[in-house]
Swiss-Prot record:
PROSITE patterns assigned to the protein according to its UniProt record, in alphabetical order: NUCLEAR_REC_DBD_1, NUCLEAR_REC_DBD_2
GO cellular component: a single term: nucleus
PANTHER family linked to this entry: KNIRPS-RELATED PROTEIN-RELATED
DNA-binding region: 2-78
Full protein name: Zygotic gap protein knirps
GO biological process: epithelial cell migration, open tracheal system; negative regulation of DNA-templated transcription; regulation of DNA-templated transcription; regulation of mitotic nuclear division; regulation of transcription by RNA polymerase II; trunk segmentation; zygotic determination of anterior/posterior axis, embryo
Intracellular or extracellular location(s): Nucleus
Positions with biased composition (Low complexity): 112-126, 375-393
Disordered: annotated segments: 112-148, 223-250, 338-357, 375-397
Record field: compositional bias (Polar residues): 225-237, 338-349
Principal location class: nucleus
SMART domains for the chain: ZnF_C4
Taxonomic lineage from the root: Eukaryota, Metazoa, Ecdysozoa, Arthropoda, Hexapoda
Organism name: Drosophila melanogaster (Fruit fly)
Key words, A-Z: Developmental protein, DNA-binding, Metal-binding, Nucleus, Receptor, Repressor, Transcription, Transcription regulation, Zinc, Zinc-finger
Gene for this chain: kni
Length: 429
């Protein structure tokens, strides 16, 4: 590259952080810029010499020199460039060498680099101005002319960049050596035109454009997600379609009709049971059988406590017939009739239970009255009657009370007389 590092003087590796630097100074500036607090103050009051040998002795002076040569964190990092960039560097070196020598090298046609004819007198004669003086004079004159003219790009000075020349060939690197007036150096151009695509402003603009596009995409995606969520929230949930199993064998039309009838019957029964919960009986259901049940079995189903003291009393159970529905009633009245019939059956069952509970008491009081009358009559005629008559009365009483019969509960024969049976019923009730 034939460029030296502006900090330590070592051969430069590229254009880093706004200046030509070597790899060591580039890395040092990148590390030190973010960790300035770790760098201690200079012990030599900032008078250290930074060169290739002792550049690592004082970090404070080295960082100060990096700032002095124009390095900054916002500067572009171009790194190693191609051949055309090296040509620019060679041109700059040539100009620097010519300015340092103070004379212009003559060309083949007797014309100097600045465009003025070379004199036959020696190069160092006092009558012939040097190349540096002539270039400075012409450059100052051209700047005055440029200030008098209206700038073609008035917005560039506001951004901190030098204004362009009126000549469009000034922006080209090789035309600066062809005219009679030393045009503006290509290194005085704005950085975004000198190296397009690598400048910090161009990178920032590209990053902002990419960020804007990303935000727009995320906004659209969020809108679509919100619309889907609101639609699922406020719309009824769609039930999954019921897949009916298809039989491998082909069914006949008669089988299909039978299956539809069975399905309709089951669906009607299930809907009736779901829509009419009042039809459920609150009382335990009585088993229906062809033979009449005994009173003891009835009481066992109703109250298990009274089974232990129930005697041989047997009563006939009044059969409960379900309400009949006429064939002329429509299907809409079926639910109404079902609920009413269930209410009536509930009331009837309650009245039957009350009747069953009252019947033993009533019979007990009747038998007590008969026993009292019989005992009074037997006491008045006890002297006149024989023991055979007494046994006959006892037999009649036993038959009335039904004590001679035995009732089976769970395989055991329980025989009680009328008095013990009635006493047990009275206590349990």
């Amino acid at each position: 590259m034939n460029q030296t590092c502006k900090v330590c003087g070592e051969p430069a590796a590229g254009f880093h952080f706004g200046a030509f630097t070597c790899e060591g100074c580039k890395s040092f500036f990148g590390r030190s810029y973010n960790n300035i607090s770790t760098i201690s103050e200079c012990k030599n009051e900032g008078k250290c010499i930074i060169d290739k040998k002792n550049r690592t002795t004082c970090k404070a002076c080295r960082l100060r020199k990096c700032y002095n040569v124009g390095m900054s964190k916002g500067g572009s990092r171009y790194g190693r460039r191609s051949n055309w960039f090296k040509i620019h560097c060679l041109l700059q070196e040539h100009e620097q060498a010519a300015a340092a020598a103070g004379k212009a090298p003559p060309l083949a046609g007797g014309v100097s680099v600045g465009g003025a004819p070379s004199a036959s007198s020696p190069v160092g004669s006092p009558h012939t101005p040097g190349f540096g003086d002539m270039a400075a004079h012409l450059h100052h004159h051209h700047q005055q002319q440029q200030q008098q003219q209206v700038p073609r790009h008035p917005h560039m000075p506001l951004l901190g960049y030098p204004s362009y020349l009126s000549d469009p060939s000034a922006a080209l690197p090789f035309f600066s050596m062809m005219g009679g007036v030393p045009h503006q150096s290509p290194f005085q151009l704005p950085p975004h035109l000198l190296f397009p695509g690598y400048h910090a402003s161009a990178a920032a603009a590209a990053a902002s454009a990419a960020d804007a596009a990303y935000r727009q995409e995320m906004y659209k995606h969020r809108q679509s997600v919100d619309s889907v969520e609101s639609q699922n929230r406020f719309s009824p949930a769609s039930q999954p379609p019921v897949v009916q199993p298809t039989s491998s064998a082909r069914q006949s039309p008669i089988d299909v009709c039978l299956e539809e009838d069975v399905h309709s019957v089951h669906s009607h029964q299930s809907s009736a049971s779901l829509l009419h919960p009042i039809a459920i009986r609150a009382t335990p259901t009585t088993p229906t059988s062809s033979s009449p049940l005994s009173f003891a079995a009835k009481m066992q189903s109703l109250s298990p406590v009274s089974v232990c003291s129930i005697g041989g009393e047997t009563t006939s159970v009044v059969p409960v017939h379900p309400p009949t529905v006429s064939a002329q009633e429509g299907p809409m009245d079926l639910s109404m009739k079902t609920s009413r019939s269930s209410v009536h059956s509930f009331n009837d069952s309650g009245s039957e239970d009350q009747e069953v509970e009252v019947a033993p008491r009533r019979k007990f009081y009747q038998l007590e009255a008969e026993c009292l009358t019989t005992s009074s009559s037997s006491s008045s005629h006890s002297a006149a009657h024989s023991p055979n008559t007494t046994t006959a009365h006892a037999e009649v009483k036993r038959q009335k009370l039904g004590g001679a019969e035995a009732t089976h509960f769970g395989g055991f024969a329980v025989a009680h007389n009328a008095a013990s049976a009635m006493r047990g019923i009275f206590v349990c009730v």
